[in-house]
């Protein structure tokens, strides 16, 4: 964001002019979008535990074989690993959302994750379903009008949803 401000100021300075109303309006819109983004990510981060918990409950209600003897989330150790992985994916989705770019999610979280799950015998479709459940919970929290700066947040919510979709597709 500071780069955009610096660029606009440098351009005006090079021309020896004050910032124009169009430039100021553009910067103002960028700040408003940034505030919405900060609010949405703050809401997700503040509710991360409940997002992961509700997604896991929904997943295990839908796929009870995962928590039955022989299931991939059976035993406390495996359940803890499952919840940890869901939390890590949520954390990297929040990084992507604040940056407005999926590269941190791709590079540091998703790259090689499918192969890791395959090597461990973890069903990718179940992981993807869990990610989709997290998406539903996170979007509900982030889109709550008491958590986000007033204004249309549909594009931001669609962007955040796309990061979850990207994560689900990477492990499926």
UniProtKB/Swiss-Prot annotation:
Topological type in the membrane: Peripheral membrane protein
Keywords: Antenna complex, Bile pigment, Chloroplast, Chromophore, Electron transport, Membrane, Methylation, Photosynthesis, Phycobilisome, Plastid, Thylakoid, Transport
GO annotation (BP), single: photosynthesis
PTM annotation (N4-methylasparagine): residues: 72
Highest taxon of the lineage: Eukaryota
Binding site for (2R,3E)-phycocyanobilin 2: 153
Alphabetized InterPro entries for the sequence: Globin-like_sf, Phycobilisome_asu/bsu, Phycobilisome_asu/bsu_sf, Phycocyanin_b
Intracellular or extracellular location(s): Plastid, Chloroplast thylakoid membrane
Keyword Glycoprotein among record annotations: no
Annotated GO CC locations: chloroplast thylakoid membrane; phycobilisome
Residues reported to bind (2R,3E)-phycocyanobilin 1: 82
Post-translational changes noted in the entry: Contains two covalently linked bilin chromophores.
Functional note: Light-harvesting photosynthetic bile pigment-protein from the phycobiliprotein complex (phycobilisome, PBS). Phycocyanin is the major phycobiliprotein in the PBS rod.
SUBUNIT field: Heterodimer of an alpha and a beta subunit, which further assembles into trimers and the trimers into hexamers. The basic functional unit of phycobiliproteins is a ring-shaped hexamer formed from two back-to-back trimers contacting via the alpha chain subunits. The trimers are composed of alpha/beta subunit heterodimers arranged around a three-fold axis of symmetry. The phycoerythrins also contain a gamma subunit which is located in the center of the hexamer.
Protein family: Belongs to the phycobiliprotein family.
Protein name: C-phycocyanin beta chain
Protein species of origin: Rhodella violacea (Red alga)
